[in-house]
Regions:
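Catalytic cores of DNA base-excision repair glycosylases
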Residues: 1-214, 223-229
Length: 230
């Protein structure tokens, strides 16, 4: 029962969550999202703030450029859309920091419109259930996109439920390393299970941290968070 999936959540709240959830677990996002929505409940509120304050409030979510891009997107929404999050995929895609996945996710989850959402969890479910592979390809390709579009229900409401359900199935059940196939509702239809769960063609590698630019940025962000002024 995530707050950004509730019916009463604003379109802006959904947009903020999609920025924060990029490469960051839900449990880390939740408290930061709640604080952001308390401080900046509308794009206009964030747009009026200094960019450095947005970065500082990003906390330990990592990849702080997302905060800068979200701030820039808020300013664009105020200047170009009268302060309202735009409701079409094309308009969303034109905002700073919004790529194809984020635009599709906001279209589906915030506006209830049909859009093909393809994240890592959804790709993994498709790879196993339909293609019989242990893991999807390392990068999204045209064949995967066509498959996702073909599987998507044509009805708008059903398509939104499909996106959310498939994403949740991949996040909670059909996980990368320890899938719990015994409780999976589609295990009897799964091509990967039927094939005997063949090994994936590669092993997922975690991102290194020590000695990287990300570690340096993290240290700098810690200093910035303690500062009283940008």
């Amino acid at each position: 029962d995530l707050p950004w999936r509730r019916a009463e959540c604003s379109t802006w709240g959904v947009m903020v969550s999609e920025f924060m959830l990029q490469q960051t677990p839900v449990k880390r996002v939740l408290p930061v999202w709640e604080e952001w929505m308390r401080r900046w409940p509308t794009p206009k509120d964030l747009a009026a703030e200094e960019s450095a304050e947005a970065v500082r409030a990003w906390g330990r979510l990592g990849y702080p450029r997302r905060a800068q891009r979200l701030h820039a997107a808020a300013q664009a929404i105020v200047l170009e859309h009268h302060g309202d999050v735009p409701g079409t995929y094309e308009q969303l895609l034109a905002l700073p920091g919004v790529g194809s996945y984020t635009a599709a996710a906001i279209t589906s989850f915030a506006f209830g419109r049909r859009a093909t959402v393809i994240d890592t969890n959804i790709r993994r479910v498709h790879a196993r259930a339909i293609s019989g592979k242990g893991l999807p390809n390392k990068s999204l390709n045209a064949a995967e996109t066509r498959l996702a579009e073909a599987l998507m229900p044509t009805d708008e409401q059903a398509s939104c439920l499909w996106n959310a359900a498939t994403m949740e199935l991949g996040a909670l059940v059909c996980t990368a390393k320890s899938p719990t196939c015994n409780i999976c509702p589609i295990r009897h239809l799964c091509a990967w299970v039927a094939a005997g769960k063949p090994e994936a063609e590669y092993t997922p590698q975690g991102q290194s941290w020590h000695g990287t630019d990300r570690q340096l940025r993290g240290a700098m962000m810690a200093v910035l968070r303690e500062a009283h002024h940008p």
